[in-house]
Structure formats: C-alpha cells, structure tokens
UniProtKB/Swiss-Prot annotation:
It comes from Mus musculus (Mouse). Residues 1-22 form a transit peptide. One of its GO terms (biological process) is fatty acid metabolic process. Pfam families: AMP-binding (PF00501), AMP-binding_C (PF13193). This is Acyl-coenzyme A synthetase ACSM4, mitochondrial. Catalyzes the activation of fatty acids by CoA to produce an acyl-CoA, the first step in fatty acid metabolism. Capable of activating medium-chain fatty acids with a preference for C6-12 fatty acids.
Length: 580
C-alpha cells in the first residue's frame, strides 16, 4: 500500500516567558516530543504543551521511526476474526488510511473542527480508522456499544447534538427510526460493503479519498472525546476528555501498568463503546509504539479465546475478571501460550481465588487496576511490587490517592471511607474536562480539595487500596457499568410493575449481576411468576441495551424507604451480599 507521509515533522520548543514556560510551534528549533517528555509532563516535571494532537505528535512520530528502522517490524494494528480474515497495518499504513478517512469526514460528510461524531461500531478495523481520523480533523469522538437500543441512541444523539453518526448495519435501522427526532444530525455514515438508503458509504468514499491531509493543530485542552457514563439517577452523563488528558495522560499507564514496549502485542478485550478500549487499544498501547491486537468474536468462547492465545504471539492480555473466572475453570496447563508474559484486569473487583488459580495454572501473575472514565487509572498492581490478592494495588502517579470521610477529612489506614484524589492548586490535566451541559454534576465531584470517586474503600498500612463498594449504586457486571435508574425506568414501563429497585447481586462468574426487586400491580399478583419474570427480562432487553437486563428478579410486597420516601437500595444490596 502506498503511503504518503507528512513532509514536515510537528515539533515543539520551550519558550521562556514571564507568565511561565509553554510550548510554541513557530520556531525553527522545534524538536518532537519524546516518551520521556510525556512521562515528565505526567509527573508534573514539565508543563502541558499548548498544542497537542495524538495523531500528529505520537502516531506520525512512530511512522517516522518505523520508516527509519528505529521500530521493530511489529504491526500497529493486527485484526483477525477467526474466519480466515486478517488485517495488519503498520503505523505508516494507519497514517495513510486515517488521512483518507479524515478527508471522508471533512469533505463528503461536511464536518468541521469541534463537531461531535457518534461512533457505534463493533471491533472492526474501521473503528480505529474513524478514531484517528477524528483526531486529525479536530472532531469530537463519541463511542457507543452496538448493544445500544433505539432509546439509548436517541438520548445520545439528542443530548450531544451530534452532527454525524458512524454506524454498522446492525445499528442503522434503529438510527433511521429516530433520525427525525434529532435535528442536529446532518450526516449518516455506514461502515458496510452494502449500500443503505439515506446513508453515505464509508468504504466506497475511502477508496476514492485523497491521502493528502494536513492535521489540525489542536490545543492540548481542546475536546477530543465524550464518554457516556452511567449514574444512579437520571440519564447517563457525558464525560468530556481533552486531547491532552487522553493523548498524554495514559503514558505512565502504558509503561508501568501495561509494561509495554514497541515489541509487544497487546490484546485488550474491552468493547469499543467503553473507555477501557481507549486506554488499552489506543492510547497507552500506541504511546509505547506497541501493537494493538483485536480478535472479533461473534460471542465470547473460552476455547476460541485460548486457541487465540496459543496461535498468535500475544505478549500482553487485559480482560475483565469475568473472563478470567471462566478461563480458570478450564485445564489451562494443556495450553502453551507462545509469548504471553503480562496479564491484567480491571473494571470490577477480582476474586483472590481467581488470581491464585490463574497463577497456579499459567505461572503468570494477574495485575489488577482500578480507575474511572473521568480520571483514568487511579490504583494498580505493578511489576516489581508485591501483589496482595484482592487489593487494587497502590495509587499511581500523578495521583495522591486518599480515603476521606463525608467532610473531606483524610482517614487513617484501616478505616473505610470514600476513595478520593487530593488536588493541588490546579486541576490535573489528565482529568476529564467536564460533564457536558451539567455544571452541577461536575462541581459535585469536588469536595474541599479532593476529587471524590463515589466509590468506597480502605487503605492498609502498606498503602494498598481495597475496594468496598460503589457509593453511587452503579452496578458493574462483566465489566459493564449499569445504572440502576436506567433499568428501573425500563421496568416501570411494563404494566405489571408498580415500582422497583435495582441493585447488584453476587455472581460467581460475572462478579455481580443486576437484580430487580419488584412490587407488582394488583392484576398481576396472581400471575405465573416464572413466566412473568421472563416477560419482564425480555421487556428490559427490548427497552435498553440487553446487557442491562435483571438476571435475578424477586417480587416483594414493598420496598424499604427512608422517611422522605426514597428507596433504600443499600438495605437491599446488603441483603444480597450477606452484610445486612
């Protein structure tokens, strides 16, 4: 494949000024930022550059290293689907194709810098192309899982005022059914070999697009992406991240938690709709010049998963605890993993038993990390440090992680409280910028001089953090964040339901699952409970993303409530977890 490279490197220089040093590009003394520079910025040893663009300042630099022989012959992206199809792109090929994709977005799609683009695609190579193309053009990338329903998509398009949606055939019918209710939406771009009435065809436009494209010089704190994050009340919030928070903020994660080099091949199992895909399948991995490996499976299968680890030279694996719980039930000693050396997990608490079984069968440690959509990785178990089974590890640079009480006072070790990040004079650049159009929720994350995560935990005498529970009642099942309000809202639409309360319930495979406590309407109180349970579960699957449906249902006469009438979910949750 012919690749056209930029003739001119994007470079920076330090300029001393009375107000403090900053980066400036208008000088013949420019020099490209290096990994050491990015690490120094993360440690607050150097200021954030005024301008930064991940495509130009990271990906294109790896293209140049690749061309000059300074990088191993390792793909930038390696995609397979188990059916014989395979895609391998070098950084140079990724650069060329993403420039063509950038021209598709700006010319036939008519998008301009700052426009928001909803992207609902499965794990296909085009997801990465669109992602990088948005970086090159200064568009705001908004990913979503293909499990989103019509109602979910409608909310996201209306709330974000998206100008464009990029989607696959699985999603196109749902989009067409609500497009008349989305006045901001101007363009529908289909990623498919087939044509669809009213949609532009990405593959067709990509073939004819020019490889010549000048990358937009974006500001470091300019919006780059928006992630919809679930909460316990109201609709999902829009957490906005900047070019710098994502593009530079995951440098230390790539080195110290993922332990990546440019020779590594990283397989991150996260769905494309979540920020974990950005962490492990874009920023942390490509900052280190490593290869992103992707296997698109129609559905998760332990045998296919293990065969993949055996067949391909994957060095680094990151997946939800649910996957490891399923894997340790197999005889792993039968498998010979070619190069696997580093295994990670996150997204929900990991059972100590699974960690121990994984090590016993594979000889490999399992390094757990804890983070949030808003601020990235907060705690992690890292190589070179002792692992305490069940612990989330220690706080990571640049964060000062503390346990605080409701008044913002730091609690001593061994005392349960809220997990919080102590702030200095300035808000860390690796934080999310804001909840879009929701200043109250944004402000509510700060208590005195702390960012409060909404999660509860304990720090031991050695500085290790232990997860206790979510203060905001969000359920994490198989790595998916599920807001109880969304499930309750779906249930209440069914005529059998008077009211409901949704909480987490322990599950040996998924860690926790959604459980609904339901008060029935009078006409349904004598119904067949088994049939009604199945009917309600199907109702939720059809009303919202299927992974949110309650796997457990209990019918009750009444729900526990406070004196003001608020449902006491904590009582029900404690009952489920045996802590009542």
């Amino acid at each position: 494949m012919k690749v056209l490279l930029h003739c001119q490197r994007l470079r920076f220089i330090w300029l001393a000024k009375p107000a403090g040093r900053h980066f400036h590009r208008d000088s013949q003394l420019w020099a490209p930022l290096t990994l050491d520079d990015f690490e120094a910025i993360n440690r607050c040893e150097k200021p954030l550059p005024k301008n930064f663009n991940f495509a130009a300042d990271v990906l294109d630099q790896w293209s140049l290293k690749e061309k000059s022989g300074e990088r191993p012959a390792n793909p930038a992206l390696w995609w397979v689907n188990g059916k014989g199809d395979e895609v391998k792109w070098s950084f140079q090929e990724l650069g060329s194709l993403s420039r063509k994709a950038a021209n598709v977005l700006t010319k036939p799609c008519g998008l301009q810098r700052g426009d928001r683009v909803a992207v609902i695609l499965p794990r296909i190579p085009e997801w990465w192309l669109i992602n990088v193309a948005c970086m090159r053009t200064g568009l705001v990338f908004m990913p979503g899982t293909i499990q989103l329903t019509r109602k979910d998509i409608l909310y996201r398009l209306q709330a974000s005022k998206a100008k464009c949606i990029v989607a696959s055939e699985e999603v196109a019918p749902a989009v067409d059914s609500i497009v008349s209710e989305c006045p901001s939406l101007k363009t529908k771009l289909l990623v498919s070999p087939h044509h669809w009435d009213g949609w532009l065809n990405f593959q067709e436009l990509l073939q004819s697009a020019s490889e010549e494209h000048n990358c937009v010089e974006t500001g470091s704190q300019e919006p780059m992406a928006i992630y919809f994050t679930s909460g316990t009340t109201g609709s999902p919030k829009m957490a906005q991240h900047s070019q710098g928070s994502l593009g530079i903020g995951y440098t230390l994660c790539g080195r110290y938690w993922l332990d990546l080099t440019s020779s590594d091949i990283m397989w991150n199992m996260s769905d494309t709709g979540w920020i974990k895909a950005a962490i492990g399948s874009v920023f942390s991995t490509w900052l280190r010049g490593a290869c992103v490996f992707v296997h698109r499976m129609a559905q998760f299968d332990t045998d296919i998963f293990l065969d993949t680890l055996t067949t391909y030279p994957i060095t680094t694996l990151c997946s939800a605890p649910t996957v490891y719980r399923m894997l340790v039930q197999k005889d792993l000693k039968r498998y010979q993993f070619k190069r696997l050396r580093h295994c990670l997990t996150g997204g929900e608490p990991l059972n100590p038993e699974v960690l121990e079984q994984w090590k016993m069968q594979t000889g490999l440690e399992l390094y757990e990390g804890y983070g949030q959509t808003e601020v990235g990785i907060i705690c992690a178990n890292r190589k070179g440090e002792a692992i305490k089974p069940g612990s989330m590890g220690k706080g990571v640079v640049p964060y000062d992680v503390q346990i605080i009480d409701e008044n913002g006072n730091i609690l001593p070790s061994g005392k349960e409280g809220e997990i919080a990040l102590r702030l200095k004079s300035d808000r860390p650049f690796c934080f999310f910028s804001e909840y879009v159009d929701n200043p109250e929720k944004t402000d509510a994350t700060i208590r005195r001089n702390f960012y409060v995560t909404g999660d509860r935990g304990v720090m031991d005498d050695d500085g290790y953090f232990w997860f206790v529970g979510r203060a905001d009642d969000v359920i994490i099942s198989s790595g998916y964040r599920i807001g109880p309000f969304e499930v309750e809202s779906a249930l209440i639409e069914h005529p059998a339901v008077v009211e409901s309360a949704v909480v987490s319930s322990p599950d040996p495979i998924r860690g926790e699952v959604v459980k609904a406590f339901i008060v029935l309407a009078a006409p349904y109180k004598c119904s067949n409970r088994e049939k009604l349970t199945a009917e309600l579960q199907d109702h939720v699957k059809n009303s919202t993303a299927p992974y949110k449906y309650p796997r457990k249902v209990e019918f009750v006469q009444e729900l526990p409530k406070t004196i003001t009438g608020k449902i006491k979910r904590n009582v029900l949750r404690d009952q489920e977890w045996g802590r009542a």
